[in-house]
């Protein structure tokens, strides 16, 4: 897709060849596995990692077989891929693939029809567990980044809290534990040599104050063309 941030980046940076190697649904643990492969095969000058909300806890949750996940005691562990009935059906239908991969329709149905009752204590415990898992993921991810930075430059791109921006908040919403993980990851990564951090929250906020245009689609939270364009420009400015 020529409108994705990596395609625009490839066009903007004539002296670089940009290769997107990410897979939809993969967490930061999988990012490191792919980066290790790329480092050994292609010896790139620069790695760019885009971190989004579900990267933290899903690095341990083993939600999607076929990916690498962090092991609590060791490094990365590959979970063998065994396609479910839904995925086998999705292979036969482009529409089902769209529902399953892009809109995560199973999760949406679970939210609508789920029987779980959320209490204050339950939410507090879930937030605490989320932070604990996320901090472990950050620690292991940064350890991998330190290794990569010995031979290559690294840019870590942090997605912005777009809902907070649309609501008029100046900073990330501190009531969302994922924003604590973003902040902690960014602060720690800045201390690693050859590593730069771009916090897209500030980039998106400046753009929204100027033009009052959303960076995502009305039906899901994926970036739209404007979101990709803004992210690619921030990367271009940093690399140049």
PLM regions: where:
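Catalytic His-Asp segment of secreted/periplasmic serine-dependent ester chemistry enzymes
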Residues: 163-240
């Amino acid at each position: 897709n020529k409108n994705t941030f990596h395609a625009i980046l490839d066009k903007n940076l004539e002296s670089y060849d940009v290769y997107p190697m990410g897979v939809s649904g993969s967490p930061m643990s999988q990012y490191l596995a792919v980066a290790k492969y790329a480092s050994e095969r292609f010896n790139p000058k620069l790695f760019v990692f885009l971190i989004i909300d579900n990267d933290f806890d899903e690095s341990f949750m083993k939600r999607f077989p076929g990916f690498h996940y962090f092991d609590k005691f060791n490094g990365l562990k590959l979970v063998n891929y065994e396609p479910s009935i839904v995925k086998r059906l999705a292979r036969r239908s482009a529409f089902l693939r769209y529902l399953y991969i892009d809109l995560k329709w199973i999760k949406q149905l679970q939210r609508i029809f789920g029987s779980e009752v959320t209490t204050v204590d339950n939410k507090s415990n879930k937030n605490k567990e989320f932070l604990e898992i996320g901090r472990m993921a950050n620690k292991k991810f940064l350890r991998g980044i330190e290794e990569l930075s010995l031979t290559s430059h690294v840019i870590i791109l942090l997605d912005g809290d777009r809902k907070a921006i649309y609501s008029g908040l100046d900073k990330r919403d501190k009531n969302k534990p994922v924003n604590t993980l973003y902040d902690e990851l960014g602060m720690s990564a800045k201390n690693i040599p050859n590593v730069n951090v771009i916090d897209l929250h500030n980039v998106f906020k400046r753009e929204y104050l100027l033009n009052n245009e959303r960076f995502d689609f009305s039906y899901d939270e994926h970036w739209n063309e404007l979101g990709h364009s803004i992210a690619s420009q921030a990367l271009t400015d940093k690399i140049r």
